[in-house]
Amino acid sequence: AMSGEAEGKPAIPGVLMADMNASMAAGMSIMIALRHAQMTGEGQEIDINLYNVAMTLMPGAASLYFGSGFVAQRGNNWLTGQNPNYNIYETKDGRYMSVGCLEKKFWSNLCAALERTDLTELIEDSSQYDYIKEQLTIAFKKRTMREWEEYLVGKDTCVTPVLNFDEACAAPQ
């Protein structure tokens, strides 16, 4: 239950991640087993289950848990909304922009684009995260999603609109 807002209910992911990745794991395992049989004449047993596959899709949470006992939950780590520079912000028209500025250059570029260079160094202090999120929430509400998309072209910010499926299919890549 790591997806969704910290104070809300878990989000339904909208994609069968474990199932799809189990299929890929099965395909790779079958190819390896066939190659092994070709080389040695021996067969292989393949054992794949959705639980184990799902756990492999959360390496950050697993490394934190098994390394330090930290339990990742909604909103308490960088992948689930704790960090202001890796988050989603609502725009003026009720759409959303996804911010993925984990690298300092992208964060600096975003702060410059927002004309909020005062936030650039604050990101180093986790006690300032709530303040920075508030400031980004205010900033992103000033334009529509499309206005942000156009405004940020060429600014190298690692910020992108959250698109509907049809928009994503039509987006140039």
Map each language-model feature to its residues:
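Active-site-adjacent "lid/gating" segments in soluble enzymes
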Residues: A1-M97, C101
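Active-site-adjacent capping/gating segments
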Residues: E167-Q173
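Short C-terminal domain-edge/linker segments immediately following a structured domain
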Residues: M2-G8, N77-Q82, L119-E121, S127-I132, ...
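Aromatic-enriched alpha-helical interface/lid elements that frame and gate functional surfaces
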Residues: N85-V159, D166
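Residues that form or immediately flank small-molecule/cofactor binding pockets and catalytic motifs
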Residues: V53-M55, N164-E167
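Compositionally biased, intrinsically disordered/low-complexity regions enriched for serine, proline
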Residues: E7-P10, C158, C169
